[in-house]
A protein has these predicted regions:
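DPxDG-like acidic metal-binding loop motif
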Residues: 75-132
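Short helix-loop capping/hinge motifs at secondary-structure junctions, enriched
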Residues: 113, 134-138, 241-245
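Residue-level signal for inorganic ion chemistry
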Residues: 17, 21, 52, 91, ...
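An extended, acidic
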Residues: 141-255
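Short secondary-structure boundary/capping segments
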Residues: 53, 73-76, 119, 137-140, ...
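Residue-level structural signal for beta-strand termini and adjacent loop
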Residues: 67, 98, 120, 132-133, ...
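N-terminal subdomain of lithium-sensitive/metallo-dependent phosphomonoesterases centered on the IMPase/IPPase/PAP
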Residues: 1-88, 160, 255
Length: 255
């Protein structure tokens, strides 16, 4: 097994789970959104768990859909390799007809760092991964930066930050879709505070870092994964040249 194998596996599994979810979405329809969300979560989780158990038998897995007992398994904390997956990021958007801002996340953490990851955006027909990291868009001098925020619960402080730095807010669905939007040039930054978990950001952060983007907590400290408490409540991902201004603005707001 080579390092490249992990990049390939992450990309393949995310894309395959995404295709399965597209088929399920088309077959089931949108008449019962809650049932569609539950079925999608479960089907993708089972697929990823079985695939990783077959392909990477000795590795641990942390999944959003794992039971509390599985999440608390102490073997994960001493493992050298842990896959961190979100089988369906953006269940709300997945169950809304016409929306494409949902994703599948597959990331690998090794000995303290994210080493591989992929974000499938099935309804948009693309997968971003560390196998072939996207080239970051060029800066737009003199143009107001755009900050991706939650479409359902945008943090109040991000609205204050946008006013302070002269930015526009762009509502987007899932965390994976928002970070992907930074990497593809739809926005220049994503700022969030108020509650997330490791599986919400591990894969897109792996891709962002491989692309050369900035990714940190909103106080500038590193994002850390495979912790005993998987809560990771805030995040900043941006084009590298914009990060100092955003971090300074956040510090000013929190004085």
């Amino acid at each position: 097994m080579t390092i490249r194998d992990d990049h390939v596996l992450a990309a393949d599994l995310a894309a395959e789970a995404g295709e399965m979810l597209l088929t399920l979405r088309e077959k089931t329809g949108f008449a019962d959104p809650s049932a569609l969300r539950a079925e999608g979560d479960t089907a993708s989780h089972l697929f990823l768990m079985e695939a990783l158990a077959t392909s990477r038998k000795g590795d641990s897995v942390l999944s959003e859909e794992a039971t509390q007992q599985e999440r608390l398994d102490p073997r994960r904390l001493t493992a050298e390799r842990v896959w961190i997956v979100d089988p369906l990021d953006g269940t709300r958007e997945f169950a809304e007809e016409g929306r494409d801002d949902w994703a599948v996340h597959v990331a690998l953490w090794e000995r303290g760092a994210l080493t591989a990851g992929a974000v499938a955006l099935p309804a948009g027909g693309r997968t971003l991964s560390t196998l072939d990291p996207p080239v970051l868009p060029a800066p737009r001098p003199g143009v107001r930066p755009r900050i991706a925020v939650s479409r359902t619960r945008p943090p109040g402080f991000v609205q204050d930050l946008a006013r302070l730095v002269g930015a526009d807010l762009v509502p987007i669905g899932s965390a994976g879709a928002k970070i992907s939007a930074v990497l593809t040039g739809e926005v220049e930054a994503y700022v969030h505070a108020g509650g997330q978990y490791e599986w919400d950001s591990a894969a897109p952060v792996a891709v962002a870092l491989a692309s050369g983007a900035h990714a940190s907590r909103i106080d500038g400290s590193p994002l850390t994964y495979n912790q005993s408490d998987p809560s990771l409540p805030d995040i900043l991902v941006s084009l590298p040249g914009l990060a100092p201004m955003l971090l300074a603005g956040i510090r000013d707001l929190h004085r």
